[in-house]
């Protein structure tokens, strides 16, 4: 099945502690049905100091389930994603506006 959300898409969080936050998808894990969104679902990781890197508390964006994300349309509102054929090509489009993504 084709991916409704892809790397680089602007999304909004629908549920959880970060509900309402917006960000850009930095990576998608289709097998786990999760995505990492910039600035969302941040966890603090404690890193030990090494000769090459400084130790301390490091903020890291953790994966969030794809069902808790919605794509932002041109108006900045959450939308569902649909697929249609334009000529020979299958394209994604925003269900609220009908615009091709």
Curated annotation (Swiss-Prot):
PROSITE patterns: RIBOSOMAL_L24. One of its GO terms (molecular function) is structural constituent of ribosome. InterPro entries: KOW (IPR005824), Rib_uL2_dom2 (IPR014722), Ribosomal_uL24 (IPR003256), Ribosomal_uL24_CS (IPR005825), Ribosomal_uL24_KOW (IPR041988), Translation_prot_SH3-like_sf (IPR008991). It holds the Pfam family KOW. Keywords: Ribonucleoprotein, Ribosomal protein, RNA-binding, rRNA-binding. GO terms for cellular component: ribonucleoprotein complex; ribosome. One of its GO terms (biological process) is translation. It comes from the Bacteria. Part of the 50S ribosomal subunit. Belongs to the universal ribosomal protein uL24 family. One of two assembly initiator proteins, it binds directly to the 5'-end of the 23S rRNA, where it nucleates assembly of the 50S subunit. One of the proteins that surrounds the polypeptide exit tunnel on the outside of the subunit. This is Large ribosomal subunit protein uL24. It comes from Cereibacter sphaeroides (strain ATCC 17025 / ATH 2.4.3). The gene is rplX.
């Amino acid at each position: 099945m084709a991916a409704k959300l892809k790397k680089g898409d602007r999304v909004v969080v629908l549920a959880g502690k970060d509900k309402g936050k917006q960000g850009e998808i930095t990576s998608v894990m289709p097998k786990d049905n999760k995505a990492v969104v910039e600035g969302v679902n941040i966890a603090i990781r404690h890193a030990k100091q090494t000769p090459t890197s400084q130790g301390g508390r490091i903020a890291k964006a953790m994966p969030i389930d794809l069902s808790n994300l919605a794509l932002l349309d041109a108006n900045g509102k959450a939308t569902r994603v649909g697929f249609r054929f334009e000529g020979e090509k299958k394209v994604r489009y925003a269900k609220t506006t009908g615009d091709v993504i």
